[in-house]
Amino acid sequence: LLIPQEFRTADNGAEHGVFCFFALADDCLEAGGDRLMAEYIARIEALPFGSDKRTALEETFYAGQRPLSYDGGGRITLPESLCQDAGLGEDVVIVGLGPRFQIWDRARWNARRDARRALARQVMNGEAV
């Protein structure tokens, strides 16, 4: 999977590769560099050690996370296990989210996109959500 240049920068800590894992909030993969990892680690470590919430995050995030290096052309190879977890087929789309990005099955993303755009419009128009 070719990762666009804007996601392979020193600014987000992804100049040499990305960390990829099943997204905690959506049925897709999430990926990013050291900056994204630091944000997740800080959120996990802010919770009391051994708490059910922290353990759930640790099990979901750390256990499923894979560091992936780029080849000479800026591509990564997604592990089959991650693809299965996210229900990815042959046709995927990369959705940029600032310092991170998501990898969606194209059909699932297309079904979600219109609802997300409508919500974004409500937020921008100051409507109660």
Give residue spans per PLM region.
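Short, Lys/Arg-rich amphipathic alpha-helical interaction segments
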Residues: 107-129
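Residue-level signal for well-ordered alpha-helical positions
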Residues: 14, 43, 89, 115-116
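Intrinsic, low-complexity N-terminal interaction/targeting segments
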Residues: 43-58, 65
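Short, structured motif recognition centered on aromatic/hydrophobic residues
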Residues: 1-3, 31, 74-78, 82, ...
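Acidic (E/D-rich), amphipathic helical modules within compact regulatory domains
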Residues: 2-46
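A short beta-strand-loop micro-motif that forms or neighbors metal/cofactor-
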Residues: 12-29, 87-104, 121
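Active-site micro-motifs of SAM-dependent methyltransferase domains
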Residues: 9, 84, 111
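Beta-rich strand-turn-strand
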Residues: 66-89
